A protein has these predicted regions:
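Beta-lactam-recognizing serine transpeptidase/beta-lactamase-like catalytic domain environment
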Residues: 1-38, 48-173
Length: 173
């Protein structure tokens, strides 16, 4: 777990369960999961995808769309429950954690604007925290289906410290 000051972004405490015996002094391959591993962030990324749409002036929370599934070329994006909730608005889609809502917004934004917003939040780059072995994660999407899945945190990787940094930017605004 990690505790951060929402106003400053400072890490106040962080702890993890080690995969080694801490009583042995020969710890040669310890990596801190806060900074040294990148993961697919999943639905937490929807927060930032919706933010990107708002910041770029294309978000209309009352606009309706058909939830459930979205066809993108030969690929299909499904909401987690596979059937959706019928025709709903984007505000409701956000509250239901709709993959199709995030995908539609990302497709409206396009690759460049979504990537620029993710870059602005610090995804895909080191945060500069003074802990060893920080990795960058990978924010890479080119095709429409990759853009769509990135909007709900699949096909990209981030580190926990990047997610914390991005979330504290919201709390601090």
């Amino acid at each position: 777990f990690t505790i951060a000051d929402a106003k400053t972004g400072a890490i106040l405490a962080s702890a993890s369960n080690p995969s080694f015996n801490p009583n042995k002094l020969d710890i040669t391959n310890y990596l801190n999961p806060l900074v040294s591993y990148a993961y697919e962030p999943g639905s937490t990324m929807k927060i930032f995808s919706f933010m990107a749409a708002m910041e770029n002036g294309i978000y209309d929370g009352s606009k309706e769309y058909m939830s459930g599934k979205l066809q993108i070329g030969s690929d299909t994006v499904n909401d987690f429950n596979k059937v959706g909730w019928g025709k709903i608005n984007f505000d409701t889609g956000f509250s239901y954690s709709s993959n199709t809502a995030a995908s539609l917004l990302a497709l409206d934004l396009g690759n460049e604007k979504l990537r620029a917003f993710y870059d602005l939040l610090g995804f895909g780059q080191k945060t500069g925290i003074t802990l060893p072995d920080e990795v960058t994660g990978k924010i890479d999407f080119q095709y429409p289906i990759e853009l769509a899945t990135a909007s709900f945190g699949q096909g990209i990787t981030t580190t926990p410290i990047q997610n914390i940094q991005a979330l504290t930017s919201i709390a601090n605004d």
